[in-house]
Amino acid sequence: MTTEHLDRIHSPADLRKLDRRDLKPIADELRAFVLESVSKTGGHLSSNLGTVELTLALHYVFDTPHDRIVWDVGHQTYPHKILTGRRDRMATLRQEGGISGFPKRSESEYDDFGTAHSSTSISAALGMAVASRNAGVARQHIAVIGDGAMSAGMAFEAMNNAGVTSDINLLVILNDNDMSISPPVGALNRYLARLMSGRFYAAAKNMGKAVLQHVPPVLELARRFEEHAKGMITSATMFEEFGFNYVGPIDGHDLDALIPTLQNLKTLQGLQFLHVVTRKGRGYKLAEVDPVLYHGPGKFDPAVGIQAAKTPAKRTFTQVFGAWLCDQAEADPRLVGITPAMREGSGLVEFEQRFPKRYFDVGIAEQHAVTFAAGLACEGQKPVVAIYSTFLQRGYDQVVHDVALQNLDVTFALDRAGLVGADGATHAGNYDIAFLRCVPNMVIATPSDENETRLLLSTCYAYPGPASVRYPRGAGCGAAVSAGLDTVPLGKGVVRRRGARIAIMGFGTLVPAALAAAEKLDATVADMRFVKPLDVELLRELAATHEALVTLEDAAVMGGAGSAVTEALNMAGLTLPVLQLGLPDVFIDHGDQAALLAGVGLDAAGIERSVRERFASLLG
């Protein structure tokens, strides 16, 4: 791969020295470099291939880092990272000690706002714009947001607030690629489709390109053109009702259209909204055909594409959930499945195919997803909300107020619990035990392997109230999974190994590591299964027959399962040493999942080491 043009770019300042016509070969080399890099490291691909020209145009037109660019979600920022001095570190992408897969303020002065969760960009850019106004600093503020992210209420809350905020410069760029991770859904997506498919759209786009090539960046002339193009496409838009001056749609891969348009918008004061149309996977045919498959691939050979594994892989927890959901739906016609735009990631593909009328993708709208489930439960339906642990944080008030307070029968399947590996701190599901344990009526189940996941899903589904089952990303220990829909007693654990003096109480998928450590420690291991209700009877037995207890969880130790155990011991008036092992009170960066766990002492060797250090006198 030749990069003779890209080799000359060490910062956006180098871009701005070039003639516009020199950018096309840079775009081609940049796209090829992104493909080659991601194929070697894994990471987000389709979205980054789709933002090459837009990224080039933004850094070419605006004075970054003085001008602020906030990238919504942020998984489309690899071209941005490459152009802002991090090209030589792309080989470390999403690896321990390497660069993040998302914008990160501590990583570069060009990363103006840390993102990874959706729909935050307009709010952040608006805050920056107001701060610049208050400080008397003249700069531009740009929020780049995808059409999938526009389905979240927060984006519209920010636009509504911006509409009544005076004397600021804010440009919102809608990157319309008709995809979030799963295809976007809802009325907004249909509205955007109507804008793009209007009878004047194609003519307007072509004429706009021709006109812009000859338009100098003069304020009045720019306004005249924008009003003319706008009138050809639509007489009024939803975005203008918020107080934004709407421009577009324009081709997001055409630098000759993008750059003059951005230059004109740069001269305007106030609220601007630019609608650009891009294609996920642009320039790599396999990703264009299947942008979902190539959304976040592992390592692969670009010449042949992603291939099926030669040897059968162990079932992932997500696959176990997906199979259970279909089986439970077959047995109970009241079951409905809900996902906030994560059909593939949460394992609902087969469920949608088999039960399309009972499948609901509500878009990137976690608050709505939870309360929608509450409404279904009010009328006798049995909703299962399949959601990443980190994204349930966005619907916490709804969990408390709309579900738990009314003791409604909603089951939460919390995928990606604990450390998630390459996606890092922004996607870690470390806090669910702590923030759910304090909510009355809520059941929290922590399965230790694949079969336990199925058992506890069935158990929580049978419970007539709010319940959550948390399980991690990836595969477990390879346990055989039963075919039935059996349940276990609610709030009851089970002893997996009998030992002496020390008892390890495991919550979740670290139980196999605890068993390995216990062989060397001659310790008892209890698979507690539930954080809430906690098996106090088993706890009392372990306290009475052992000299020390160890609690173990792949979640934040502060407020977690270990805290529940110490609280229960205190309530019972029982006093004995307790070692609480879990995730420390820090944000843990990206890296290999197993290596990160080992780094905080939560592999078998680390568990053994911690127990020996704390209870050396008991172990001799």
Curated annotation (Swiss-Prot):
Q: How is the cofactor bound, in the record's words?
A: Binds 1 Mg(2+) ion per subunit.
One GO MF annotation is: 1-deoxy-D-xylulose-5-phosphate synthase activity
Keyword Magnesium set for record: yes
EC number of the protein: 2.2.1.7
Instruction: Tell me which domain of life the UniProt entry assigns to the organism this sequence originates from.
Output: Bacteria
Q: Which residues bind thiamine diphosphate?
A: H75, A116, H117, S118, G148, A149, N177, Y284, E366
List the InterPro entries hit by this protein, alphabetically. Dxylulose-5-P_synthase, THDP-binding, Transketo_C/PFOR_II, Transketolase-like_Pyr-bd, Transketolase_BS, Transketolase_C, Transketolase_CS
Keyword Metal-binding in annotation:
yes
Tell me, which GO biological process terms does this entry list? 1-deoxy-D-xylulose 5-phosphate biosynthetic process; isopentenyl diphosphate biosynthetic process, methylerythritol 4-phosphate pathway; terpenoid biosynthetic process; thiamine biosynthetic process
Q: In which pathway does it act?
A: Metabolic intermediate biosynthesis; 1-deoxy-D-xylulose 5-phosphate biosynthesis; 1-deoxy-D-xylulose 5-phosphate from D-glyceraldehyde 3-phosphate and pyruvate: step 1/1
Q: What is the uppermost EC class here? A: transferase
Q: Cite a single Pfam family from the UniProt record.
A: DXP_synthase_N
What are the record's GO terms for cellular component?
A: cytosol
Provide the cofactor list for this protein.
Mg(2+); thiamine diphosphate
- Keywords linked to the UniProt accession: Isoprene biosynthesis, Magnesium, Metal-binding, Thiamine biosynthesis, Thiamine pyrophosphate, Transferase
Catalysed reactions, semicolon-separated? D-glyceraldehyde 3-phosphate + pyruvate + H(+) = 1-deoxy-D-xylulose 5-phosphate + CO2
Residues annotated to bind Mg(2+): D147, N177
Q: Whom does it interact with, and what assembly results?
A: Homodimer.
Q: What does this protein do?
A: Catalyzes the acyloin condensation reaction between C atoms 2 and 3 of pyruvate and glyceraldehyde 3-phosphate to yield 1-deoxy-D-xylulose-5-phosphate (DXP).
Q: Which HAMAP family match?
A: DXP_synth (MF_00315)
Instruction: Tell me its family.
Output: Belongs to the transketolase family. DXPS subfamily.
What is the protein's given name?
Answer: 1-deoxy-D-xylulose-5-phosphate synthase
Please name the source species: Bordetella avium (strain 197N)
